From Swiss-Prot:
The keyword Ribonucleoprotein does not apply. It is found in: Cell membrane. It is a peripheral membrane protein. This is Putative membrane protein insertion efficiency factor. InterPro entries: Membr_insert_effic_factor_YidD. It comes from the Bacteria. The keyword Glycosyltransferase does not apply. Its main location: membrane. NCBIfam families: membrane protein insertion efficiency factor YidD. Belongs to the UPF0161 family.
Length: 78
């Protein structure tokens, strides 16, 4: 299941996102890359982290550098 989700994200990155003339995501790494890394690191639990990131990626967010945490948690680090 994780592999299928990762393949879908890569398809999005290479097919849809690459066609956009400008960057849309407010964060680094991008939301799709964050979801991909979260899935690879935490398996299906990574969906929760990636979904939380997608909810935070909106016009009123400051954005910035927000890497996948080393340990699975929903608490803010820093």
């Amino acid at each position: 299941m994780v592999r299928i989700l990762c393949d879908l994200i890569r398809w999005y990155q290479q097919g849809i996102s690459a066609q956009r003339p400008f960057r849309v995501c407010r964060f680094t790494p991008s939301c799709s890359q964050y979801m991909l890394e979260a899935l690879q690191r935490f398996g299906l639990k990574g969906i929760l982290l990636g979904s939380w990131r997608l909810l935070r990626c909106q016009p009123f967010s400051r954005g910035g550098y927000d890497p996948v945490p080393n340990h699975f948690t929903f608490r803010r680090q820093g």
